[in-house]
């Protein structure tokens, strides 16, 4: 059991950077969970980390701060590619854990040193827009923060969370998962 289920930073990202991140999105595709099913019409777009190193440079220090200040102190070594998520009216994301069904799913990708033999340890959501209604991020049954553009939240990847239905406007967020060796 963790003492702090999340750690957040208000106005961590400038509105200019939020707009810049949204502009990185190419073609969106349907978002899936690890069981391969599509859960509503949420759109996601992968951001090429090789082309957008500045995103890692921006968010890595916040992740380190959250990991330390929340008291998790997880061994984190790398991160996945960033994903920009777009939610339209009626879109939502069902309750799930990012660490997959058993919370300890180890990546078996020998050709990728950043992912191979690692598990998701810390999840991140950056709020990129705020001109929408609904769409609250709920973590472990609670809504921990306001959805203002520029806000940033981290939580252990094994904690359940969901995005409530968007009732108007478009919700943009940026997600990533920080990885390390399997929990012992």
Predicted regions and their residues:
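Fe(II)/2-oxoglutarate oxygenase catalytic core
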Residues: 1-154, 158-184
């Amino acid at each position: 059991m963790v003492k702090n289920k999340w750690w957040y930073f208000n106005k961590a990202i400038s509105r200019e950077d939020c707009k810049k991140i949204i502009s990185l999105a190419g073609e969106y595709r349907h978002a899936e969970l690890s069981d391969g099913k599509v859960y509503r019409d949420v759109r996601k777009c992968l951001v090429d980390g090789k082309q957008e190193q500045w995103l890692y440079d921006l968010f890595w220090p916040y992740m380190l701060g959250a990991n330390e200040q929340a008291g998790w102190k997880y061994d984190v070594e790398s991160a996945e590619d960033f994903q920009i998520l777009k939610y339209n009216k009626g879109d939502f994301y069902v309750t799930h854990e990012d660490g997959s069904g058993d919370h300890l799913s180890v990546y078996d990708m020998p050709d990728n040193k950043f992912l191979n033999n690692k598990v998701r340890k810390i999840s991140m959501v950056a709020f990129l827009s705020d001109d929408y209604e609904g769409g609250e991020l709920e973590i472990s049954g609670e809504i921990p923060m306001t959805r203002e553009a520029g806000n940033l939240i981290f939580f252990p990847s094994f904690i359940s969370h969901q995005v409530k239905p968007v009732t108007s406007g478009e919700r943009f967020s940026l997600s990533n998962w920080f990885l390390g060796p399997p929990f012992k």
